[in-house]
Amino acid sequence: FINTLSPDLKNRTIFNLETSERTKFSFVPIERRGTSFKDFDKYQKKAALKLLRASLSKKGYNKSEKIRQLEKVLLKIEIPRLVFKGKEIIRDYLDYHFWLFGVPSKDSLWGWKFEGHHVSFNFTLKNNKIISSTPSFLGANPAVVNIEGFKKLQVLKSEMNLGSMLVSSFNIKQNKIAQFSKNAPIDIITKNDFKARKISPLGINYNELNSLQKKLFLKLLNEYINNYRFGFAEDLRTKVYSSGIKKLHFAYAGEINSSKGFYYRIQGGDLLIEYDNIQNNANHVHTVVRDLSNDWAESILKDHYKGQHKIH
């Protein structure tokens, strides 16, 4: 990817690993630094997409690309145009940005970011291996598309359906434990904070589920984990399981299949997954995965810099 860029594009794409730009995290339509598809010729676009494809699973890559296509839908249906922070927003599926942090090589520590409206992936690599892919955000607006030419596209369908199926399976006692509010929060609770605040692990514990519910719960959990490239997905799965699958909780708020909105989260150990669908009469989904101890490879970078300090 780097080798396809002109000197000017390199200057706008490559940053130091230590820059605060690396840990900026946003999923709304704002102006961003880095370079975007709008800056690239067809060869650079191809190389950029190849980098993204190499960093995600096929499932994660396809979701990301379909979310970009939703910008075309919004361009058709948003009349009058959305005004955000005093500026009219013109939807553009090319307005997705790339940053590289540090010097990519098989022996170095470096990172890169892909971000635009409703997509944010943050990767850190060491010794040619992805060691962090969080925070990661995927959203969909509309959650279900019902206009000509898009065949009722529903990008985050499994996230919605599996969560709804799990809630629908609860008996009265389980539901009282799992539901922490009749009203869904207006957005994901951790927002786009650099450091996701630790929130209470409310809801029903994995041990309180029956065997079929446990299977549903794990299928839902893995729907999120399997967006990542296989190696990192397995590392994250191992971390979650080794810290104790029995410590995981599922909590929800609002109502399924309702225009009032639906929210759920999976939480345990360092893992936090949030799903929220309340905006636009519950047709606008936000999802996020956070590693409370290692977003942006925070814990690994601390050890790395400690080691450098000792050497000097």
Roles of regions detected by a PLM:
Residues 1-312:
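A cross-kingdom marker for long, charged
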